[in-house]
Amino acid sequence: MTREIFDKIAPGWYNFRHWSIFRNELDGLAERWSQGSLLNVGCGHGPDFLQFKDNFRLYGIDFSRVMLEYARKYSGKFGFSPVLVQCDIRNLPFADSAFDYAIAVATYHHIKDKAERLTALLELKRVLKPGGEAFITLWNRWQPRFFFSGNEPVVPWRIRDEVVYRYYYLFSYRRAEKLVKQAGFRLIKSFPESSYHYPVKCFSRNICLLVRRPNSDKLSS
């Protein structure tokens, strides 16, 4: 997955996904967390900020320059002013323990290398304050759409006469939970998106994780 691909899809994505598909989850988190500093990891054009715009100090990062341009447009439209930074999520330009909370919606499953996925989550833990919480979503390997696709599909996106392909690493609940624990987070809960209404969670489209950096955590862990 390259910056160029996300730069290309940014205009269409701005119109296609103008509202977060996790509005219910983010509403609950805004109430749970109440106020503080919040980092949006892989913020794209910014719809996942909306639930936090009134009571939080907002920061957003993305490696796509064009996505961040649309995030400025989006935040201006809805009357909030996040600090937006272009960077690599594997090397965050923030001090240790800088943020009270974080969200990362549909971000880490775009990282192809296993070690780099862990590195990115270790960076997230580093910039969270001890006791700080993060909400992470990942695509589920066992959603019906990908039953026969393997763990690493490429998903097409059409831009006029061009088709670009987005890489995904698909997680099972077990793999997702193992990864965040390996990064040193405490898993509070894992659950499907609110629009999924079946009794067995393992076939949901998304895996949602609420995690916490332990109060006694050491950055070297």
Which positions does each model-derived feature cover?
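Class I (Rossmann-like) S-adenosyl-L-methionine-dependent methyltransferase catalytic domain
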Residues: 1-35, 39, 44-91, 115, ...
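A short SAM/SAH-binding and catalytic strip from SAM-dependent methyltransferases
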Residues: 101-115
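Active-site phosphate/pyrophosphate-handling residues
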Residues: 4, 106, 119
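A short acidic, Gly/Pro-enriched loop at the edge of an enzyme's catalytic core
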Residues: 90-102
